[in-house]
Regions:
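Glycine/proline-rich active-site loop of Rossmann-fold NAD(P)-dependent oxidoreductases
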Residues: 275-278, 290-304, 322-332
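Active-site Tyr-X1-5-Lys
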Residues: 251-280
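NAD(P)H-binding glycine-rich loop region in Rossmannoid oxidoreductase-like domains
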Residues: 111, 129-201, 213
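Mid/C-terminal beta-alpha module of Rossmann-like enzyme folds, strongest
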Residues: 316-368, 395-399, 403-406
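Substrate-positioning beta->alpha
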Residues: 205, 309-321
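N-terminal Rossmann NAD(P)H-binding glycine-rich loop of SDR-like oxidoreductase domains
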Residues: 96-123
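Conserved Rossmann-fold NAD(P)-dependent oxidoreductase catalytic core, especially the SDR/UDP-sugar
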Residues: 178, 182, 187-258, 281
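Conserved C-terminal active-site "lid" loop/helix of NAD(P)H-dependent oxidoreductases
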Residues: 364-384
């Protein structure tokens, strides 16, 4: 899953671009003039909030005002349906006094989810890599204090391989949101050690802790569209949905180890849930708007040169709704639409004709139908997905507000 703002940044290159995220340097070939810890991306051990998003790892230490601005500007983007709006007050009352755990809380989705949970009345135990690192936790405390909810936010050290610590965090909680997952945008020398084992064992440790804690009624696992595709065997012309699973053999042959790790982790979660009787639901987001660039994709993987787009606020809301609604079950594909690079560039050029947006050749690969995707299960729960026009506008305006583009 690729960082949408980064792609827009690449599309909207202008001469006065003065501050450059180091994660984008390979793509833009522009030297970075300012670097410091990023306040929105998880770091250190490569543990992030997602979710299939190809997030920066320890090697990428950046000042990321874009993400901060994006969180701010996108605050109102995800809309509740009329029915859901009427239920907000009731659910806030229901959530009062409830405590939930969020792993990967300092990341892009995690931070948005924490804010929404606090707004809804939950006490939140926010799992981060280093609670003493202000660069990692400062924005969490700030958003809680700004909402007058500082006393209901509790930050704890979250090591996915430390089962005892996870159990301590889960005790007394009614729900667990598992977002953290190892990820890297760089080639890995040992996929098993660096990605697969931590992803699978980390997920299982969270589920074991939730089961042993006793009071957890539901666990929401953040998977990814990377666990849904690529799937070369999926019927041509049929848009992938929750029934589709990534072809692990295909990914292993093509070195797509992140997709392998997310797929195996989700399958392990479903196996554990079935064997142990734990209530687990899964959200599979597509491209979440954020300051991230994709790993290189070779020609044999041109099938992945499409973007499954979704607003970060929609993703956060989806997590809450599948937790709160007893009827929610199984996987929940969380995307607004499927589009190609050529479509994306054309839409940006249409909305912002003053920018010199590069043109991409029309996609001609078989099976790459342009299709609107209705994530029917989430829509039924009350999610109204932000249209691609709004996703683009929010992203571009965030870049403009921070001086990345004029």
């Amino acid at each position: 899953m690729y960082g949408f703002l980064s792609h827009l940044h690449c599309l909207l290159q202008v001469a006065n671009l003065t501050v450059q995220c180091s994660a984008m340097v390979p793509c833009l070939s522009i030297n970075s003039k300012a670097q410091s810890d990023c306040d929105c991306c998880a770091r250190s051990k490569g543990c992030c909030d997602f979710v299939g998003s190809g997030v920066p790892t320890a090697s990428i230490k950046i000042q990321c005002p874009v993400a901060t601005a994006t969180r701010r500007s996108s605050h109102q983007s995800a809309q509740l349906s009329e029915k859901t709006t009427r239920e907000v007050g009731q659910r806030r009352a229901m959530a009062s006094g409830e405590t939930v755990v969020v792993t990967g809380a300092s990341g892009f989705i995690g931070s948005t989810l924490v804010r929404r949970l606090l707004d809804r009345g939950y006490d939140v135990r926010a799992g981060v890599l280093n609670p003493d690192d202000k660069a990692e936790t400062g924005h969490l405390h700030a958003l809680a204090a700004g909402a007058g909810e500082g006393r209901r936010l509790h930050v704890f050290r979250c090591d996915l391989l430390d089962g005892a610590a996870l159990l301590d965090a889960a005790r007394g909680c009614s729900g667990v949101f598992h977002l953290a997952s190892p990820c890297t945008i760089d080639p890995v020398s040992d996929p098993q050690k660096q990605l697969i084992v931590p992803a699978v064992e980390g997920t299982l440790n969270v589920l074991r802790a939730a089961k042993e804690a006793g009071g957890v009624r539901r666990v929401v696992v953040t998977s990814s569209n990377a666990a849904i595709m690529p799937s070369p065997g999926w019927p041509a012309g049929e848009v992938p949905d929750e029934r589709c699973w990534t072809d692990i053999d295909y990914c292993e042959k093509n070195g797509l180890w992140y997709s392998v790790s997310k797929t195996l982790a989700e399958k392990a979660a479903w196996k554990f849930a079935a064997e142990e009787g734990l209530d687990v639901v899964v959200v599979n987001p597509g491209t979440v708007m954020g300051p991230i660039i994709p790993p290189a994709i070779n020609s044999s993987m041109s099938v992945l040169l499409r973007l499954l787009q979704v607003h970060v606020e929609d993703v956060a809301l989806a997590h809450i709704l599948v937790f709160e609604n007893p009827s929610a079950s199984g996987r929940h594909l969380c995307i607004e639409s499927i589009s190609h690079w050529s479509d994306l560039a054309a839409k940006v050029a249409e909305l912002y004709p003053n920018y010199k947006v590069p043109k991409f050749p029309k996609d001609t690969q078989p099976g790459l139908e342009r299709a609107e995707v209705g994530s029917k299960k989430l829509i039924a729960l009350g999610v109204q997905f932000s249209p691609i026009e709004k996703i683009i506008r929010d992203a571009v305006e965030s870049l403009k507000s921070r001086g990345y583009i004029s």
